[in-house]
C-alpha cells in the first residue's frame, strides 16, 4: 500500500461527492446523516495522523456548512501523508474512504 493508493481513493471519493449540495449531505444514513458519516471519517484520519506524528489527538470542528467537509477531508489526508504512517494505516485509510464511498 502506498500513498498513491490513498490518493486514488481520495480522488474517487471526491469525484463522487465533491459536487453535492446541502440536501444530499443531510440525507439520513445509519446513525445520522451522510455528513455525520464523513465527519467521522475526517476525525479518524486526523487521529491517525496525530498518532503517526506522536502528537495528541485533537477534536475536528464540525463546521456549520457541510460543503466544507470535502475540504476538511483533503486537509487531513494531506496531514496523514505528511506524517509518513505505516503501510497498515495507509491501507486502512484507503479502505475506509472506499467503504464510505460505496455506502454513500
What are the language-model segments listed below?
Residues 17, 42-45, 60, 70, ...:
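Extended aliphatic helical segments
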Residues 14, 18, 46, 50, ...:
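Alpha-helical repeat scaffolds in large eukaryotic proteins
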Residues 22-69:
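Amphipathic alpha-helical interaction modules
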Residues 1-42, 94, 101:
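Short terminal alpha-helical segments
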Residues 70-104:
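Amphipathic alpha-helical binding modules
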